[in-house]
Every structure is written in C-alpha cells, then in structure tokens.
C-alpha cells in the first residue's frame, strides 16, 4: 500500500488517485467523490459531477451532508434524518457525513485502488470503501463492504450531476423497473420556502408519464431534465430482479457525453 495523495479541494480535505484516463478526488468528510475527470487523455475531458457553490464561503451549515456536498457518495441509511428503534440518524447517515480514514493506495498492474474505512457509531459496524481505476477504462469501480451490522437499512449511492441551464438538455433513462413511485410524503414544503410539482405517493410505469399535483397537465416527462424550474421533486424506481445489472444513464447533449451507473439489482 502506498500513501494516498492528499489535497484540499473546494474547501474539503480530499484524497486523489489517477491514471491516464481518469482522475478522482474523494473527501475525507462524508466520502463525497468529486471532482472526477474522465477522458483526460483526450481533447475533450469530461467532468460530470456537481460541487456545491458554497465551498469556501465560511457559511454555517446545520445539515451535515450539505457541508462537503458534491459528486457521488454512499448513504446508509439513505433518506431524511430520522429515529428508528432508538437509533437517531442524520440525513443519509454517518458514511455520508462523518470522517473516513484512508488505508492507502495500491497499484497492481493496470489497476489503481484507494481504500477507506469508517467505524460507525449510531449503528455499530465497519464500512470499507474501495474506489478503483483500471487502465483504458473511463469508469470508476465502487465497492462498499459492510461488516458487523444487523437489522434492515436503506442503502443508496447519491450521484449528484452538474446540470446546465437549458431546459431538457439531459436525457434520463433506466433499465426496466417493476415499480415507479413519487415520494410518499411532502418534498417541497412551502413553510421551508420550497415547492413541489410531482404528486404524492403515486405509482407510475414510465418515466415519460409521472403524475403531477395538478390536472392540466396531469403528468410530467421525467426523461428530460432540467424541467419545472423552481420545484423540488423526488421519485424512485425499483429495478426488476434480473441477472443483468440495473442501470441509469444521463445523456448530456450539449457537451456530447453519456454518464452511466451500473449496480447489482439484488443489492
């Protein structure tokens, strides 16, 4: 194991690994992965991930996950802050908000791997994060190993993409899903100076026709983004259990690239 390169990026202490195709940074606080540069050996490198604009402004931020907010990060439990069976969890859990320890970088032939660990306290256990780059691949291979836990928990990878201003400039698609549903509760609360447009707790079978709160139009095309500027919306799709990976894509037409994520639908 080699010592990982450490650098302050966007106000956050981060570890950095790279090969000819990809360079990535991951924050010590929360393990948020960004910036990530793909295709760095070409004339048109791609940086698909968002980095929150308040970094370096010295703001007091009460929600821990918003302090380093950027890129992609692991959530356990995924969701709003809540108390469950005596466990009081912050939004998206300790892995997305607490400090990780770097265990080093290993370069083995064409593979470069960064390993990080965290011992959680609210629900005691250990999480091992591995971020891996392979020569010739414009991909980040991500693995999280959970040890010592018992009981159910919602897991999630929170990919946060940088989005331009032009409405509908990103095309969103997914693998086949068995259930689509809008959030069962209020997401955009006017009392918090937010508004939502999607209906509450409604099922759907196509991203192109997702129920809205109003009747005209009654549905929204969620295969295009940005859309309905000014509204805060949330929906979920649940993959069909198949042997093939579940996937999500975002085609960024103005910049000429496609971002994708693959995962095991059984997890």
Positions of predicted regions on the chain:
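Surface-exposed acidic/polar loop and edge beta-strand patches at domain peripheries
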Residues: 1-141, 149-154, 158-267
């Amino acid at each position: 194991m080699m010592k990982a390169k450490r650098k302050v990026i966007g106000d956050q202490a981060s570890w950095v690994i790279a090969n000819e195709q990809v360079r990535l940074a991951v924050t010590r606080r929360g393990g948020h992965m960004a910036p990530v540069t793909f295709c760095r050996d070409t004339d048109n490198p791609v940086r698909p991930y968002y980095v929150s604009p308040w970094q370096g402004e010295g703001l007091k931020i009460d929600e821990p996950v918003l302090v380093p907010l950027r890129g992609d990060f692991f959530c356990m439990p995924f969701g709003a802050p809540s108390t469950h069976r005596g466990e009081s969890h912050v939004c998206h859990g300790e892995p997305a908000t607490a400090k990780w320890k770097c265990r080093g970088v290993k370069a083995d032939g064409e593979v470069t791997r960064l390993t990080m660990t965290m011992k959680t306290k609210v629900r005691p256990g250990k999480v091992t994060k591995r971020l891996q780059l392979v020569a010739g691949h414009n991909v980040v291979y991500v693995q999280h190993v959970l040890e010592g836990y018992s009981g159910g928990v919602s897991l999630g990878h929170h990919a946060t993409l940088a989005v331009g201003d032009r409405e509908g400039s990103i095309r969103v698609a997914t693998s086949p899903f068995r259930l689509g549903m809008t959030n069962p509760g209020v997401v955009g609360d006017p009392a918090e100076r937010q508004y939502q447009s999607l209906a509450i707790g409604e099922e759907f079978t196509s991203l192109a026709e997702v129920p809205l709160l109003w009747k005209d139009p009654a549905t929204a095309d969620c295969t295009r983004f940005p859309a309905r500027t000014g509204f805060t919306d949330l929906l979920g799709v649940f993959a069909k259990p198949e042997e093939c990976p579940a996937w999500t894509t975002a085609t960024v037409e103005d910049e000429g690239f496609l971002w994708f994520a693959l995962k095991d639908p059984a997890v």
